[in-house]
Curated annotation (Swiss-Prot):
InterPro entries in the record: DXP_reductoisomerase, DXP_reductoisomerase_C
GO cellular component: chloroplast stroma
Disulfides per UniProt: none
Cell compartments where the protein resides: Plastid, Chloroplast stroma
UniProt-recorded name of the protein: 1-deoxy-D-xylulose 5-phosphate reductoisomerase
Ligand binding (Mn(2+)): D3, E5, E74
SUPFAM superfamilies: Glyceraldehyde-3-phosphate dehydrogenase-like, C-terminal domain
Pfam families given in the database record: DXP_redisom_C
Pathway: Isoprenoid biosynthesis; isopentenyl diphosphate biosynthesis via DXP pathway; isopentenyl diphosphate from 1-deoxy-D-xylulose 5-phosphate: step 1/6
Sorted UniProt keywords: Chloroplast, Isomerase, Metal-binding, Oxidoreductase, Plastid
General function of this protein: Enzyme of the plastid non-mevalonate pathway for isoprenoid biosynthesis that catalyzes the NADPH-dependent rearrangement and reduction of 1-deoxy-D-xylulose-5-phosphate (DXP) to 2-C-methyl-D-erythritol 4-phosphate (MEP). Required for chloroplast development.
UniProt GO BP: isopentenyl diphosphate biosynthetic process, methylerythritol 4-phosphate pathway involved in terpenoid biosynthetic process
Residues where 1-deoxy-D-xylulose 5-phosphate binds: S4, E5, S29, H52, S65, N70, K71, E74
Length: 106
């Protein structure tokens, strides 16, 4: 897998017996708006979305990160790549961006 999140999952599940994967946890930095009160979201501009707190990326992926759109795509990817049910895929906000994803096993 090309995404760091999915690559981490792939590495975690190597050697697991069939059926041992209980849950996939994808992490998200939270993007540029993670500390913004919900009522302020109506006022944000594209320039605000481009101020990612952790990463220097291209414009599209930075906006996708700020809106968490990229996490929606990553959930779909994890579902198809690893055969996980959508209810077994979680997103956790992890502002430090140290862990890219985790798995829970039985």
């Amino acid at each position: 897998p090309a995404d760091s999140e999915h690559s981490a999952i792939f590495q975690c599940i190597q050697g697991l017996p069939e059926g041992a994967l209980r849950r996939i946890i994808l992490t998200a930095s939270g993007g540029a708006f993670r500390d913004l009160p919900v009522e302020k979201l109506k006022e944000v501009k594209v320039a605000d979305a481009l101020k990612h707190p952790n990463w220097n990326m291209g414009k599209k992926i930075t906006v996708d990160s700020a809106t968490l759109f990229n996490k929606g795509l990553e959930v779909i990817e994890a579902h198809y790549l690893f055969g996980a049910e959508y209810d077994d895929i979680e997103i956790v906000i992890h502002p430090q961006s140290i862990i890219h994803s985790m798995v829970e096993t039985q």
